[in-house]
Amino acid sequence: MADGALRGYGVLVTGGGTGIGRACAEALAVDGAVVTICGRTESSLTDAVDAIRPGYGGSVHHVVADVTSEDDVRAAVAATVANAGSLRGVVANAGGGGGLGPYNVQDLGQFEAVLRLNVVGTMLCVKHSVPEMVASGGGSFVGMSSIAGHQNHPHFGAYTVAKAGIEAMMRNAADEFGRSNVRFNAIRPGFIATEMMDFVPRDGEVFASYLRNTPLAPASDTGVGEPSDVGALARFLIGPESRWITGTAINVDGGQALRAGPNFSSFIAPGLGDDVMAGNRPADD
C-alpha cells in the first residue's frame, strides 16, 4: 500500500508508455515518486501521463527516447534529473523479442536487433544513470528480464539470450557499485497480460501450456499475471524497504518456473517443416 515512502524520488522508467512499464510508472508515482517515462511513441507516453494519478506529491513526465541511442538515453537521464532534482532509481523496462524459430533459421540482423534493444539498451541506461545515482548518495536500478532468461523457452531466438544477458549485467553491476550504495536487481515476468502477448491465441495450445504449467493459474480469473503485479515489485525494489537486496532476480510468474516453459513449435513447425525444426537446412538456403 502506498504510504509516500518514495516522495521526491526521481525515477526513470524506460518503455513507460504501455504495459509493464506504464504499471511500474504508476506504482512509483502513486507513492510520491517524480517519474519520467520514455519511449519511442509520444502518443503512448502522453496517454500514460494523462491516465496516471500520482499521490503524495508525485508526478509523471515524459520524454521521447530510443534506448538503443546513447544520445537519447543521456537526454532521458538528464530530463529525469531536471524534473526531480536528482536520480534515485531506474526501471529499465524497454525491450522486446522477435524471430521465433530454431537457431538454424535465425536471421542475423533480427537477432542482433533484439540483443541491441534489450542488452545494449539496458547497458546504456546503466552507464548514464550510475553517476547520477552516486551523486544522490545511492539508488536502485531494476532491469527487466523474463523467466525466459533462465528457463528453457525453445524457439524464442535471441530473446532468451538477451534476458539472460540482462541478469548477468545486473549481478556484475551490483558487485561493481555496491560500495556507492547503488543496487541492481532483475525482475523475471512470466506471462503477463500486455499488448506484447496479444499474439498468443487464448484458445490455442500455447496458451493452454502456460496454464498447465502455472501453479497459481487455477486461482486466477485469467490464469495469467497483470502488469500491476510487476509494477508492485518494481516499486518495492526502488524503495527503501529493499535496501539490503542487490544482485538478484525475482520471478513474477505465478510459479511457472517451477514447471516448464511454453512450447511455441505449434506456431512455427507448420511453416518450416519437421526437417528444418530438427536442424536441417531450409530447402531454399
Describe the function of each predicted region.
Residues 101-103, 107-112, 210:
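Substrate-binding pocket helix/loop in short-chain dehydrogenase/reductase
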Residues 178, 183, 245-247:
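Short, small/polar-rich loop/turn modules that mediate ligand/substrate recognition or access, typified
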Residues 146:
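Residue(s) in the substrate-gating loop at a strand-loop-helix junction
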Residues 186, 205-245, 252-254, 278-285:
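C-terminal helical subdomain
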Residues 10, 15-19:
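Conserved glycine-rich cofactor-binding loop
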Residues 126, 162, 170:
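Active-site helix of classical SDR
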Residues 131, 175-176, 243:
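Alpha-helical segment proximal to the catalytic Tyr-Lys
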